[in-house]
Amino acid sequence: MTINRFLVGGITFCAACMVSVTMSGETKSNAGSAYLLSQTKDMSRDFSDLSNTYFFADSLVSFNTADGTGIVEWKRQQLMPRQAFNANTYLHQPLKSLDFPDTAYPQNPRLSFTVVPVNARTLRIRVYTSPVTPKENDYESVMLAGQPVYDSSEWKISREGDDIYYISPYGSLEITGYPWRLVLRDASGKELTRTRVWSDNDSTQVKVAPFSFIKRGSDNSRSINPVWSISPGERIYGFGESATPLDKVGQQLNLFVTDPQGPETPDMYKPIPFFFSNRGYGMFMHTSAPVTADVGRSYIGANKLFMADEEMDLFVFFGNPKEILGEYTALSGRPEMPPLWSFGTWMSRISYFTEDEGREVARQLRANKIPSDVIHFDTGWFDVDWQCDYEFSPERFKNPAKMISDLKKEGFHISLWQLPYFVPGNKYFPELVEKGLAVKNGKGTLPYEDAVLDFTNPATVEWYQEKLGKLLSMGVGAIKVDFGEAAPIEAVYDNGSTGWYEHNIYPVRYNKAVADVTRKVNGENIIWARSAWSGSQRYPLHWGGDAASTDTGMEGTVRSGLSLGLSGFCFWSNDIGGFVTSTPEELYRRWLPMGFLTSHSRAHGAPPTEPWLYDNKEFTDYFRKCAQLKYALMPYIYTEAKECTETGLPMYRALLVEFPDDPGAWSVDDQYMFGSQMMVAPLFENVESRNVYLPGDADWIDYQSGKRYAPGWRDIKADGDLRCVILVRDGAVIPHAAVAQSTDRIDWDNIEWKHYGTPGVKKGKIFKPGMTEISVVDF
């Protein structure tokens, strides 16, 4: 990674605000109409800008197999307009350099790249666009769980003529000399993907630019664009919490942390620069700069990774989904086990405003025998709604410490909302500005009207954690880490970096600051966060944001959670019923079982969220049954959660992870595995049944009715009390507990093992509080 990009003479530039032409010939002009504040950035525009200079990877000049360092020559080109039969397009053409003095700036620069094996399944490939390369240890990447430990013992490195080969038991990399190209193969030698070169172009009109970088005419900064091939039938997954179809081929994704105001658009609270393919490879773009991934959208055979970074730092993985997720999370980190109580019911709305409201909600939950562990106070616990000052309103909360203590005795933990932005009317606003704790722009002033905490400043982190620490010491169990998507991109941060590198990574620093102080005070690994980037998965947990209270909002929520799980996140939640408006009872009934069959479950949104406030009194009974299901399954959930922390696999799991050899599993994105043994197919409309894909070669057992279903597509009725299709793998042994009103009252000494399907010798798994490892039980 290179820092201080776009910072020239103290001025921050936005290179996208220029006239550009797309590959299809469509003109896009941003002149005089720059991106709106915090708007998602499309970095592909840089690579169709007539004012930029283009450099294309051409030939291998040298390579040292002993240390993995090489030199590539890059050919200088420019974009030239072209008219043909009343159509205006453009083509890349060779460009003679006019740089002065010409002795200092070569026509075709020769720049370094490196290849380093991390382990038998992982390679790190770095390609530089400048003669000045960053030192390996000159910064601590918050995206990684420490510096990688390199082990090349299982790799054989050889040279044949101008070509270089890296071969391990799991895959290989071929570096061709001319044209310079990277080719990935599996252990059998089958090609997985390769970087595209000019000779790959086979269309008369669409000339796909190969691996390149640009030097921006506005500020001489650089961006790089590795272009990889996409094969027929290839499917690509990951890139973060996207509500679009799980298979990203045919899509363009802007990896730029933003507030999409719900999981219904391609924009994301949690973009993640990681993906994998059904062909057996994955890639992690180790950058915090904006990235645009054109995954076969503009050209079906090309996966273009437009990185607003001056180097490509790419980790390449070989394996199936479980193996690739394991390798990626071993690098970027896995979470410690969240506390048991966090897996229980969180009851919330926007917002409880008084101590009396909080106590009454707790009373109603216990009176109605709805198992629950958390009461969440959202934006209304301060004197002024939404103005975070870390203090309970003295008028509406007479004795918050006693309230917290009393509720804890009843089995309730308290969660509190806050955010890292301070409006001018906030009492802390002057202090943050005076002490330099807020982010500044190139002029040394605030880039926004609000003061935004600068988490690259150790003094800011100390100030912030002192405020949260007092609340946690009072007995608060969790802090809601809301927002974090609007870190100023036009800013200069305390560590010297600009917003082009700090915007996307702001959520990781934000998540970490809260997680660290929570662990320090409470000894527990728990937050409740909305925004994320690679590395945030170390700090559970994250929820899906402000879903619409609609059928499509529910469906988008499922896809978002599955996509985030395929991007390395073990734990995830959502606002049961949606957030934006009051949830219709019929929709709430369908959403509840799906919401409770998630690692973490919170009823939250526009009131009412409390079931006893609905006109239909039977709805409280239904809500209770959904909560009771989760508490009965708590031994299974807790055990599966522990396994996820050890493997990096998601609890909310796409079918393709468990069934990679079943082609049908790769196309399903509206049902999910809940852990390794259970499958959930929500009802997204007011219907009684739905088509469900049953993967694998064994039968599935209906959890509610006991009916048996053969593999394949089946129309299955939600045959039980809960409006959801819930299935268990044939042969599974699921541990259950007697339903308790809170997780601290579960009797872990009396586990009931329920056997599903075919009789025979079986094994079960169990992880209980106080245990250090999962125990396997034979039956």
Task: Give the positions of each predicted feature.
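An acidic- and aromatic-residue-enriched active-site/binding cleft used to recognize and process polar
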Residues: 118-120, 128-130, 169-171, 178-180, ...
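N-terminal accessory segment at the very beginning of proteins
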Residues: 21-332, 340, 350, 357, ...
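Bacterial Sec-dependent N-terminal signal peptides
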Residues: 1-31
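Acidic (Asp/Glu)-rich catalytic clusters
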Residues: 333-336, 366-369, 562-563
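Catalytic core of carbohydrate-active enzymes
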Residues: 515-517, 524-525, 532-543, 556-560, ...
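Beta-sheet entry/capping signal
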Residues: 122-123, 172, 181, 273, ...
